[in-house]
A protein has these predicted regions:
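Short amphipathic alpha-helix that is part of the acyltransferase structural core
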Residues: 1-30, 54
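Short secondary-structure boundary/capping segments
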Residues: 7, 38-40, 97
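Short, basic/aromatic recognition patches
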Residues: 32-37
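A short helix-loop-beta-strand connector motif used in the catalytic cores of GNAT acetyltransferases and
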Residues: 38-49
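Conserved beta-strand in the GNAT
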Residues: 49, 56-64, 70-72, 77
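Conserved acetyl-CoA-binding loop-helix of GNAT-fold acetyltransferases
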Residues: 78, 84-97
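Short, intrinsically disordered, charge-balanced linker/junction segments flanking boundaries
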Residues: 100-104
Length: 104
């Protein structure tokens, strides 16, 4: 499957819909879930989406970074129907490059 890795912030609706197709959502407490998700999406410093040919989001990576030395991946998920196709690895490579990569 061909995917494009996009640097973009997901809307709360997009992210919640994606969570239904992955096990990633199980990490979030149920209390005030819909209230907290917009803040999570707004405050993350790095947000990537893997999008297939039809425009469907099939992978997500979010993290915190200083864009110089460090990257902390907080969320990495792939659609259950698309696992074992290298999508997570593509997201990690793109995140590493955007966060500073190996420049030294």
């Amino acid at each position: 499957m061909a995917v494009t890795i996009q640097e973009r912030r997901l809307t709360p609706e997009e992210y919640i819909e994606f969570l239904k197709r992955t096990d990633l959502g199980s990490q979030y407490p149920r209390e005030r879930f819909r209230e907290r998700i917009p803040r999570l999406l707004e405050k993350t410093s790095l947000s990537l989406a893997a999008v297939d040919e039809t425009g469907k989001i099939v992978g997500v990576l979010m993290g915190l970074t200083d864009f110089a030395y460090w990257l902390f991946v907080t969320d990495l998920g792939v659609d259950r129907g698309c696992v074992r196709q290298g999508i997570g690895a593509q997201l990690m490579r793109k995140a590493h490059a955007l966060a500073g990569g190996e420049k030294d």
